[in-house]
Amino acid sequence: IESAAAGAAVSVSAVDSSKILNVAVGVGGAGKVAVQGAASTALVNKQTQAVLEATDIDKDDDNAARADVTVKAQSDSKIFNTAVVAAGAGTAAVGAGVAVNRIVQQTGAEVQGGTMNLQELDIRAVAAPKIETIGVGGAVGGNVGVSGSVAVNMIANDVTAHIGSGAVIAVNGSVGVVAQSDEQISNYAGTLSGGGTAAVGVSTSVNQISGTTGAFIGDEGESTVKTSVSAKGNGSGIKTDSTVKDEQIHDTLIDKDTLAMGSQIERTAAVQKGIVVDASSTRDLKSFLVNASGGMYAGVAATVNVNLIEGATDAKISNAILNGGIAGSGSRADVSVRAGDYTNSAGFVGSLGIGVEGAGIGAGSDTNTVSRDVTAQVADSDIKAQALKVAAEGKQGISSFTVGMGAAGVGAGVAGVVTVSKMDNTTKAVLTGATADVTTLDVEANHLARTNAGNISTGGAGVGAGIGLSVGVLPDDSVPGAEVRGSTVNSSGNQSRT
């Protein structure tokens, strides 16, 4: 490809948007026995790729009118699922619902090989998968009422921006390799059971978010050909939205942000010049479950919620030469390698069991685990720059509130709640096996973790016994670290490792 004139543009773009709206309703009634069920499944599985491979742009003429090159992949997915189940009968009523929602997607923007002399290069992969679920269920029987619900919501999201395969790129302005992902799950469910003799209600929810968001220059492995990228930092720069303020991370049990459907972590925009390798990801998961059962002799309500978050955010330069073709130190642009990872997880569980003359049992469990690896790394590379910054940042917040109540007029009121909130994150900034000729060097890793958990367990009886049990387990095994090893650094300014 040869530029026809100044301001020429080359664009490779892949954009995909998917939306599923699912409504399921099941209603059953009978004089004696009614059994009603409803099941819904929504699945999204896709790949969105924008690739510029083995392509030369103004290869033979470094003084040509240079082009602006954009390689962009964007994938948005949304599932909205509503389910209503109701059953009523003179003797026994049973209502049960099952919902499974899953999004699996891979989004990539890449430049592989080729020789290019450009004005600007912007490689950008963006993905935003979202699941929203609302479920309501009830069962009322003259003698027995039983209701149950199971919800499974899963997002597996991989986002990659990459320059590799020995590409040789010289840019008068800036180079951006940007990967960005924003994931959301909002789950709301309520069940009600009633029976003249006994009522039982059971609700279970499992919500999982996983995947890797990565921005890379070069290829890992000793046998690979080095990728070369140079930039002078002229022009308008590269737009990023990769930082998140502390106030965006949960720091309370309940407020409008931890409850509201559609709320998400807000990003802060910035513009950077030079060579920008930037990977950032946010995820907001909230699950709200309420379960109530009442019977003359027994009312049993049990509610279980599990939120699982795992995966990684990586920004890496490997086996690469950066600004190697620029002679004067004053003409070398900055090099920024940044990985930012931000998580909010909220679980709210309520169970109420009422037995007028017998036993009322309310049990609830809420589990939130966050396990994310955040890495910003320069490895086995030669870099010349005004400022070289390698930064990793991880911020995670958990809000968990569990209520269990058991009440009986005559007999026993029993309540038990368990809360488990676990952090197991690594946040690393690493310079290893590198040769850096820079004015300033910063290698920093920052980590913020907040856990807010509350339990209420109440068992009471007018005549008889009241028993309440509450258990909370809140470990944090997160490890941050910044290191420089096996590297040669020539610097005329400041060096820092934090």
Predicted stretch roles:
Residues 1-498:
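Low-complexity, glycine- and small/polar-enriched segments
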